Design a protein with these regions (language model features):
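Bacterial Sec-dependent N-terminal signal peptides
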Residues: 1-24
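Cysteine-nucleophile amide-bond enzymes
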Residues: 20-222
């Protein structure tokens, strides 16, 4: 069966950063806060004129970080910061949060932590497992609505729409240990309800042109 790739491009917009108030789970607080502060200072020195260019530069700083899946799955749910292990999602979130922080002329790890929380959780609020934006499509929609990202897929002339229902997690409950908890399951199910027969913009790979993609764009392939 031919595989179809759904591609979303997002350009970073400026937002106001303030210090985080919620508890944070660091993998190693001294190492993490030092690495974040150092990276933010170095990123600020680059003086990039557009925030999305900062995403690219931040990504380059951590491109060699060892891959590790499941780093966010500890209980209870709280913002987790781990600069020594990243997966596809946490890599993008880290680069984006750093870009937003520096774009706002901040170089404090506390401001970075705040921006990371804003990106990772629905409405920027940590309220249990279900408040995390588990689906990349939901992540794009929620952050776009709050002005942290700008969805630009449908602005490209050869973009199309696919009607999809987000229900993979609750349809594969056994694959997600946290969903054994009935409250977590109900919360994720409630989030999925907002995406029943939802129209998602996408571009087929053969229709992508180099001129459509700018440095720092976030591209999600499914």
């Amino acid at each position: 069966m031919k595989r179809i790739y759904l591609i979303a491009l997002a350009a970073i917009l400026l937002t106001t950063a303030v210090s985080a108030q919620r508890p944070v789970r660091f993998r190693n607080e001294t190492v993490d806060t030092t690495r974040i502060t150092t990276a933010l200072i170095e990123l600020d020195k680059k003086k990039k004129p557009m925030p999305q260019l900062l995403v690219s530069e931040a990504g380059k700083m951590f491109i060699s970080t060892p891959y590790a899946a499941g780093t966010l799955e500890e209980s209870p749910e709280m913002l987790t910061v781990d600069t020594e292990h990243l997966d596809c999602t946490t890599f993008v979130e880290m680069a984006t949060a750093m870009a937003i922080t520096v774009a706002n002329r901040r170089t404090s790890w506390r401001d970075y932590v705040y921006n990371l929380q804003q990106l990772r959780y629905r409405g920027g609020n940590v309220d249990g497992y279900a408040s995390r934006l588990h689906y990349i499509s939901d992540w794009i929609v929620d952050n776009s609505h709050r002005g942290l990202l700008q969805e630009v897929t449908d602005r490209i002339g050869h973009a199309d729409y696919a009607v999809k229902t987000l229900d993979y997690m609750t349809s594969h409950r056994a694959s997600y240990p946290a969903l054994a908890d009935s409250a977590n399951f109900a919360g994720v199910k409630n989030a999925e309800i907002g995406y029943v027969s939802h129209g998602f913009p996408y571009i087929k790979p053969q229709n992508i042109k180099n001129s459509d993609i700018r440095e720092g764009d976030i591209i999600a392939s499914v």
